[in-house]
């Protein structure tokens, strides 16, 4: 990896899988130090020596037979990427690109689920103080790929992902993430949950101890997985449904430096 005078990585040289050949790629920056262009890798011989950007640019056009052998980023005034022009003359001539827009949620757009510390219940939107998140309370990022397929991501003021939505012609595929009051992820509700409302077969559940460690994980349609930790918060024992039927545990023993020393199965673990 080679860097420019400002410490930005520009030229990357790596060994490929066959015959010790190397490939080189280039990252170009604009006047504000933002990533502007990323050139596709080109073969450069069998050494890891530095290759000038101008050589990479000319080699890329010749190797791929395309003057647009690179992707190009466009930014807004806040330095966020708003669109990416994809490599290839055919993509460029058709103005096919990946686009990203930034906004906020509107009324009746995102359902409001709740989970509370000390309970294992999922509180559905109709049972909360407000069924939908009020307008403007969530950040919304909309991504549209070159084929016109759209996905949306909603996050709260703490940066927690609340909803990932994939737009479909027949409806939306919504995955909700539910947190408790102290920011612990408690439930992940898959798109099928929005149809059947059955937590046991369509939701992921995580339970924590008083130190914020996951002690039980419940996956859709599976027996729960249980975890035990030592005083240093290292995982020492776990048991899934199949192990439970056989009376087994998977254990881990660490050395004095906290490195994994022994792992195995046992029928009687000291889970304290």
Question: Where are the regions a protein language model picked out?
Answer:
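Beta-strand elements of repeat-based all-beta scaffolds
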Residues: 1-272
């Amino acid at each position: 990896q080679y860097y420019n005078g400002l410490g930005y990585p520009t030229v990357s040289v790596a060994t490929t899988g066959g015959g010790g050949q190397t490939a080189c790629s280039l990252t170009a920056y604009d006047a504000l130090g933002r990533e502007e262009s990323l050139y596709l890798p080109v073969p450069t011989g069998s050494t890891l020596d530095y290759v000038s950007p101008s050589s990479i640019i000319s080699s890329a056009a010749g190797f791929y037979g395309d003057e647009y052998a690179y992707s190009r980023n466009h930014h807004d005034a806040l330095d966020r990427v708003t669109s990416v022009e994809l490599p290839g003359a055919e993509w460029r001539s058709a103005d096919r690109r990946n686009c990203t827009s930034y906004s906020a949620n509107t009324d009746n757009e995102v359902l409001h689920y709740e989970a509370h510390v000390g309970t294992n219940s999922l509180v559905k939107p109709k049972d909360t103080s407000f069924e939908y998140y009020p307008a403007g309370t969530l950040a919304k990022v909309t991504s549209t790929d070159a084929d016109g397929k759209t996905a949306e991501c909603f996050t709260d003021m703490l940066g927690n992902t609340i909803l990932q939505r994939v737009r479909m012609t027949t409806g939306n595929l919504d995955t909700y993430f539910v947190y408790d009051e102290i920011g612990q992820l408690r439930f992940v509700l898959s798109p099928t949950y929005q149809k059947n409302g059955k937590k046991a077969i369509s939701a992921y559940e995580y339970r924590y101890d008083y130190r914020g460690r996951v002690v039980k994980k419940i996956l859709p349609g599976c027996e729960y997985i249980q975890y035990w930790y030592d005083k240093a918060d290292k995982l020492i024992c776990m048991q899934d449904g199949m192990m439970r039927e056989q009376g087994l545990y998977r254990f881990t023993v660490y050395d004095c430096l906290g490195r994994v020393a022994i792992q195995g199965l046992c029928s009687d673990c000291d889970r304290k």
